[in-house]
Amino acid sequence: MSLVGRVGSLISQGVYSVATPFHPFGGAIDVIVVQQQDGSFRSTPWYVRFGKFQGVLKGAEKFVRISVNGTEADFHMYLDNSGEAYFIREVDPAANDTNNLISGSENNNGNQNNGVTYRLEHSLSDSGTGELREGFDPLSRLERTESDCNRRFYDFQDDPPSPTSEYGSARFDNLNVESYGDSQGSDSEVVLVSIDGHILTAPVSVAEQEAENLRLNTPQFHLAPGDGTEFCEGNTEFASSETPWDTEYIDKVEESSDTANIASDKVDAINDERNDLDSHSRDNAEKDSHDAERDLLGSCLEQSELTKTSENVKSEEPGPTFEDRNLKEGEFPLRTIMENDRSEDEVTIESIDTLVDSFESSTTQITIEEVKTTEGSRISVDSNADSECKDEQTSAETAILFNNQESSISVDSNADSECKDEQPRISAETAILINNQEGGIIESEDQDSERVSIDSTREEVDKDNEDRKTVVSVGVTSSVDEGEPDTDQRYELSLCKDELRQGMGLSAAAEVFDAHMISKEEYINSATSILESENLVVRIRETYMPWTKAARIVLGKAVFDLDLDIQPDDVISVEENESPKPKDDETTITPSSSGTRWRLWPIPFRRVKTVEHTGSNSSSEEDLFVDSEPGLQNSPETQSTTESRHESPRRQLVRTNVPTNEQIASLNLKDGQNMITFSFSTRVLGTQQVDAHIYRWRWDTKIVISDVDGTITKSDVLGQFMPFIGKDWTQSGVAKLFSAIKENGYQLLFLSARAIVQAYLTRNFLNNLKQDGKALPTGPVVISPDGLFPALYREVIRRAPHEFKIACLEDIRKLFPTDYNPFYAGFGNRDTDELSYRKLGIPKGKIFIINPKGEVATGHRIDVKKSYTSLHTLVNDMFPPTSLVEQEDYNPWNFWKLPIEEVE
């Protein structure tokens, strides 16, 4: 029993001496940073793994904090579902600059890839070639290699290895950031109005999309049936009809040749707010229906000239004419095709004189003039007898509300100067609203302009404004004033729940959200899988909510027009102890003079371009999010926000394991060894942490490489297990020899094909190794990227550790100048070690192979066998101090030694 007790104590002593904070599925590998001649830095990849079990953690917890020498860095890493840490870097796709990584670090010489994306994949194959390879795909797809053979430098999958390289340069994968604008697509159109799932659009060709403004002279508007049901079910971008739009809209007006649908005896009025308007509209509808029946094939669109001035409006100063606003005389014929039980009702406006206004940029101002009544106009309404407009909300949202169907409308462009101060803002999306609170269009002598604002709520008519006779709003999306908060909301979707965490900051959260934002094409192709994803997050202004929490708000808004409150518990709090700042596009409005509110759609439209056709193309483009929010005056802050949103689709984010030169410089590394800690906190597991070292070397450093298993230890397999039971299984004299080499100015590099999960054990084994009072000198411990079983399979069964070693050493060599070889000598225990060292250009005389008996052979010379102890006596000859200026070829050891005899 005493023997068993002693064995148990030895095992416990050995385990606790090397495995105090042991992570069975994770680890971090030492990093080498080389300072260049110009002061910049190059680094080996930072490979950190916490284990696959971390994949079940919440996205808000997957941020890895970095601490160097006890000081926390000002940047962090991300943690993926496999427990692997990585950096995200933004590159400029316009220049196709991926920073041309060398050994996973930035090429600080300023080299670019000149339009071609390069990546470091398998930096060495079996033959040991480790050149940069041209990427097969541009930075537009996610390239994440999961198999062992495709890992570069480290692989965290427990798969069998392949003959290809496993220690390559940094993984430099592209995060798929789709352009979420429509400006890069095919011919687009301008959304002018939306009525119950229908879209009023004007076509914009591809060539015209590059212009900042487009002017519509006499465009044809087609009101096509939209997919209202699908739109309400979650589409955040408005889908228009599938048919291509006619782009010849400048000088031509399409004549309607469709067969008119002859309606029955009665048509309900569009607006049922006034009974007299009800009956009046019904009588005119019946009359026009019989007129259309006599015409057989429908109505003919008549053109009339715009009334530029009004005889009854007195103004001291003439306002801007239509020529000043780049308008051409004409009218806007509208054809509305609405779907009702698979039958089409056609509403034709045959002669309306003034449904034309300025389609300038989103900052265009326009005065709403007085409305005049003209006799002789006619509006024909053809509708099925069964189609009745019973919904007050629907009638309130109708694009054109007719108040007197026996009238034509003229807009006076000569407005009083006082009206000019009340000009509402107009964007590319134009709604045409004609409303009369008294049941008809009445001539008014009032000089003040009246405005109608489109908002998400409809208010009652103010009693103070009942004396105002007419309200005409042409091209108004919203009125921008201050005083009333914006109540409308815009929803954006992204699959980033696993990467959002509490307190990460608004800018960091926005970066992560935009990196995984769902575009319209992605939603159309895979809407079901997106909605079922657990990582789906909805952004409402600056608020981030999981889809499970935001579904009630989005659906309530889309279906029932409800503005449900956002519960604080439902929100992912990404603010850094500060209240969220309101977005630039959150504006306030005041009630319009008429007191009546109109809204076109309860949820956002898709992105469209400002419409104004000019002779020259503008260098700047501006995209707008079109919705029912109040319009926004283009202040400098607003323009910068809009431009940044327009540029965001062009951003390219890449995944890499190498920090930038600026990030490395911010760490303030000291020469030699630096302690680095990687940690993240979870509510369940607490703080998880792995440690490693960063070694800062100069560009002219000389490196001596040493294998671990079989070279420092006595055998490959037993050397990994004997330290666990407290047994000394090391080669005698190794600590003293390596210490003497280090004292002469050389840096030691410990290279092992062990798995990454053994990084901590290997590092502590070497740090605790002492012989005759002499400790083994410190140096970076670089080990294999593979999992435990693939590493053992390659090391013990296949006997091919050189595959990893050659690739690893090649990448380290690339940290140094191209005309300088930093590797001076190498120690190993196998022929494969010699093969690896020869590939790196180490001469035969500096390659030392040791056998299990402790005998050291140089250059396979069997008759000249030494031990580590005997080599120590020659250390100053074989490893002369680096401070000496004497050339090594002429020192006593190399100059006077006997040449090797030639064997015939």
From Swiss-Prot:
One of its GO terms (biological process) is cellular response to phosphate starvation. Contains 1 Asp-Xaa-Asp-Xaa-Thr (DXDXT) motif, a catalytic motif essential for phosphatidate phosphatase activity. It catalyses: a 1,2-diacyl-sn-glycero-3-phosphate + H2O = a 1,2-diacyl-sn-glycerol + phosphate. Belongs to the lipin family. It comes from Arabidopsis thaliana (Mouse-ear cress). Residues 265-293, 311-326, 449-470 have a biased composition (Basic and acidic residues). Transmembrane segments: none annotated. This is Phosphatidate phosphatase PAH1. The lineage of its organism: Eukaryota, Viridiplantae, Streptophyta, Embryophyta, Tracheophyta. SUPFAM superfamilies: HAD-like.
